[in-house]
């Protein structure tokens, strides 16, 4: 399947669009976003977002004691006449102090000074699932005893995440558990971008990096998080089913699972393993397999082993580029047949289209060395490799305009490094393969002993065998995540 030429497919660059929950309030939304840029005092901000002291301390105590019962918070009882002022938009903030270089701890301290120490959580000390179980559980316990202030705070709460894409995805994934537990509403999430790529942050208008003048920017960001509109975001479940006995070191976003399932009705080219291991997780932006993941894997290992070599964004990019060359991303076609390293040799791709229950086999072009399934408009620090496609090309290929909440993943391929480079500077679009509502990959070994994969920037090495296939199944999570729009 050939990608279009530049003139056929690419229009002027557009800001990614997301559907707003408040469809009738366009003027109201515009006004609120404009108000978010107005200078706001510390006192005004606190009045808008800070919880009453008795609830702040009760939530803290429940988390420390790992007990969500009302009794665990009884050390600070509500006032006899509970006339505590309910904040308009109560905020809870999660900070990854390892993000943002040396600024992470300072940003955490500034946040605590602005809205109270008890409303800012260090993710190295309090995990998001602990806050959800014990902190929100504490609020719900107060509300069940007739505390109207606690009830309103639980209903109005918003979350701010200060960190990179991985941190944001971690918090979103934990919040998604509230849907399964029928503990509604699920708080929407705002983003304070402290990571490297920050593609989630870019896609929802929070920017690609935090401003240099971060002290004043924090206050504006908190205010904007309390007034900006909310959008929906698809999330995607991934299940990897592999032969038992294979050893894999998965990223923290993948967890071991016993729920392995292989669709016997689907055409399988290899052999089904007699016994299996499984890993399961959720991603929000992209999953990829191939050379891009191999380069990312090498870079991440170097950064972990020798952090002093990757101490800033410029150094990171230089090292990343060096890995791209050393792994053969650029030079393979000069020294060998590029088809020998194409993913076609190890991978079979099946998809389901939107509103279809039938699997369809999709050919992988032999020149493609990386396949990416993309949910957002932003990949690789703000690039849009799928491109903004013209309507006639969309109709010709049977595609629809890509959105973050349309129930579809855009699948594209990258060839040798020069092709990837031109895609990344948006001179051309990637090699369009398909749009899919569900994906099944079958990978099998041979001359290749490992495949490299990554999910929202977290790479790993996936072992393969000659005898049995490994399967990767991707499907949409039924409940969408809620993200506050920053623009």
Curated annotation (Swiss-Prot):
Give the matching SMART domains: DAGKa, DAGKc
Q: Provide the disulphide bond pattern.
A: none
Predominant localisation class: endoplasmic reticulum
Q: Which GO terms describe its cellular component?
A: cytosol; endoplasmic reticulum
InterPro entries (alphabetical): ATP-NAD_kinase_N (IPR017438), DGK (IPR037607), Diacylglycerol_kin_accessory (IPR000756), Diacylglycerol_kinase_cat_dom (IPR001206), Diacylglycerol_kinase_pln (IPR016961), NAD/diacylglycerol_kinase_sf (IPR016064)
UniProt note: phenotype after gene disruption = Reduced plant size with small and curly leaves. Reduced growth rate of pollen tubes and reduced number of seeds. No visible phenotype under normal growth conditions, but the double mutants dgk2 and dgk4 exhibit defective pollen growth and seed development because of non-viable male gametophyte.
Reported tissue expression: Highly expressed in pollen grains. Expressed in roots, hypocotyls, leaf vasculature, developing anthers and stigmas, and receptacles of siliques.
According to the record, the segments passing through the membrane are none
What Pfam families does UniProt report for this protein, alphabetically? DAGK_acc, DAGK_cat
Q: Where is the DAGKc domain?
A: 86-242
SUPFAM superfamilies (alphabetical): NAD kinase/diacylglycerol kinase-like (SSF111331)
Q: Where is the signal peptide?
A: none
Gene Ontology MF annotations = ATP binding; ATP-dependent diacylglycerol kinase activity
Q: Where in the cell is it found?
A: Endoplasmic reticulum; Cytoplasm, Cytosol
What family does the entry list? Belongs to the eukaryotic diacylglycerol kinase family.
Reported function: Phosphorylates the second messenger diacylglycerol (DAG) to generate phosphatidic acid (PA), another important signaling molecule. PA is required for plant development and responses to abiotic stress and pathogen attack. May be involved in the accumulation of PA during cold stress. Involved in the regulation of PA and phosphatidylcholine biosynthesis in growing pollen tubes. Required for nitric oxide-dependent pollen tube growth and re-orientation responses.
Q: Which PANTHER family match?
A: DIACYLGLYCEROL KINASE, EYE-SPECIFIC DIACYLGLYCEROL KINASE
Protein name, per record? Diacylglycerol kinase 4
Q: What is the lineage of its organism?
A: Eukaryota, Viridiplantae, Streptophyta, Embryophyta, Tracheophyta
């Amino acid at each position: 399947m050939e990608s279009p030429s530049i003139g056929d497919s690419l229009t002027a660059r557009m800001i990614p669009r997301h559907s707003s929950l408040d469809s009738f309030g366009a003027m109201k939304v515009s006004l609120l976003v404009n108000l978010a840029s107005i200078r706001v005092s510390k006192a005004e901000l606190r009045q808008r977002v800070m919880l009453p002291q008795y609830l702040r301390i009760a939530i803290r105590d429940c988390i420390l004691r790992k007990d969500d019962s009302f009794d665990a918070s009884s050390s600070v009882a509500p006032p006899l006449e509970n006339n505590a002022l309910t904040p308009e938009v109560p905020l809870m903030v999660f900070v990854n102090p390892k993000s943002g270089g040396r600024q992470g701890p300072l940003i955490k301290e500034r946040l605590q000074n602005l809205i109270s120490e008890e409303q800012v959580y260090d993710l190295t000390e309090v995990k998001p699932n602990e806050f959800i179980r014990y902190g929100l559980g504490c609020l719900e316990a107060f509300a069940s005893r007739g505390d109207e202030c606690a009830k309103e705070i639980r209903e109005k709460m918003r979350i701010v995440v200060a960190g990179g894409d991985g941190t944001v995805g971690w918090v979103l994934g934990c919040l998604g558990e509230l849907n399964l537990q029928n503990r509604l509403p699920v708080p929407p999430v705002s983003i304070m971008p402290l990571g490297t790529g920050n593609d989630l942050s870019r896609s929802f208008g929070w920017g690609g990096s935090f401003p240099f003048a971060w002290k004043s920017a924090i206050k504006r960001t908190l205010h904007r998080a309390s007034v900006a509109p909310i959008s929906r975001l698809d999330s995607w479940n991934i299940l990897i089913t592999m032969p038992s006995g294979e050893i894999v070191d998965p990223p923290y976003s993948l967890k071991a699972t016993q729920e392995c399932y292989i669709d016997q009705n689907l055409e399988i080219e290899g052999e089904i393993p007699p016994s299996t291991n499984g890993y399961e997780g959720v991603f929000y932006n992209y999953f990829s397999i191939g050379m891009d993941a191999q380069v990312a894997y090498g870079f991440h290992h170097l950064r972990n082993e020798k952090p002093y070599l990757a101490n800033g964004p410029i150094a990171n990019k230089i090292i990343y580029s060096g890995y791209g060359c050393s792994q053969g991303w650029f030079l393979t076609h000069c020294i060998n047949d590029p088809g020998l390293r194409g993913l076609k040799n190890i991978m079979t791709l099946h998809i389901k289209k939107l509103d279809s229950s039938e699997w369809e086999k999709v050919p992988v072009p032999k020149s493609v060395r990386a396949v990416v399934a993309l949910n957002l408009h932003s990949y690789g620090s703000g690039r849009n490799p799928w491109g903004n496609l013209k309507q006639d090309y969309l109709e010709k290929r049977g595609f629809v305009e890509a959105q973050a909440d349309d129930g579809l993943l855009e699948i594209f391929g990258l060839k040798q490094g020069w092709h990837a480079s031109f895609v990344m500077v948006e001179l051309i679009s990637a090699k369009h393969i398909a749009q899919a509502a569900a994906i099944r990959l079958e990978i099998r070994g041979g001359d290749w002993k490992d495949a490299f994969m990554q999910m929202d920037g977290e790479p790993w090495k996936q072992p393969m065998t000659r005898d049995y296939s490994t399967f990767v199944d991707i499907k949409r999570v039924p409940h969408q995540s809620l993200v506050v729009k920053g623009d």
